[in-house]
């Protein structure tokens, strides 16, 4: 059950009215063995979506290029039919992780969503400087791809997080 206190815009010109909603869906998928260097999942979901229907076809994969470098591509296509209108949303993303040492890595995630026409990127560095204590540096950026020319900046941020484990 999901309750919306106010209307919720899900796509350009399509909003879901306030109110309570229940969902039922059926899903089928095929998973390739995660123990292999190349693995993945293909799936399909069909079911209710607020006052309408949703069909999703998705793929997610994992490729261990080397012992230190891994890529995880994924794509999801949703066809949504609602009383207020129909739309298709495609979300494509790729995650890459490069392990510098057993105690540090650099990871990046790039994602595109067609319904909002946005692309976002997130780059994260993690260093465990002693067991249980970490330093994270994260750079994030989101851009609107709908106007002509270069994608317009929506948001940008840098976060530094420092944790320290105290043992008693």
List each model region and its residues:
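Exposed, low-structure sequence patches enriched in small/polar residues
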Residues: 1-168
């Amino acid at each position: 059950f999901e309750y919306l206190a106010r209307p919720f815009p899900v796509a350009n010109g399509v909003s879901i009215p306030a109110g309570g909603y229940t969902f039922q869906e059926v899903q089928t998928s095929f998973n390739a063995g995660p123990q292999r260097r190349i693995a993945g999942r293909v799936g399909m979901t069909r079911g209710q979506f607020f006052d309408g229907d949703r069909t999703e076809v998705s793929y997610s994969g994992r490729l261990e290029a080397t012992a230190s470098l891994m890529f995880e591509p994924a794509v999801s296509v949703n066809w949504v039919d609602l009383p207020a209108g129909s739309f298709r949303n495609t979300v494509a993303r790729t995650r890459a992780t490069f392990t510098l040492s057993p105690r540090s890595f650099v990871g990046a995630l790039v994602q595109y969503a067609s319904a909002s026409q946005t692309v976002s990127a997130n780059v994260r560095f993690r260093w465990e400087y002693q067991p249980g204590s970490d330093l994270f540096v994260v750079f994030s950026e989101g851009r609107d791809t709908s106007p002509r020319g270069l994608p317009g900046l929506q948001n940008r941020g840098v976060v530094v997080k420092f944790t320290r484990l105290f043992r008693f």
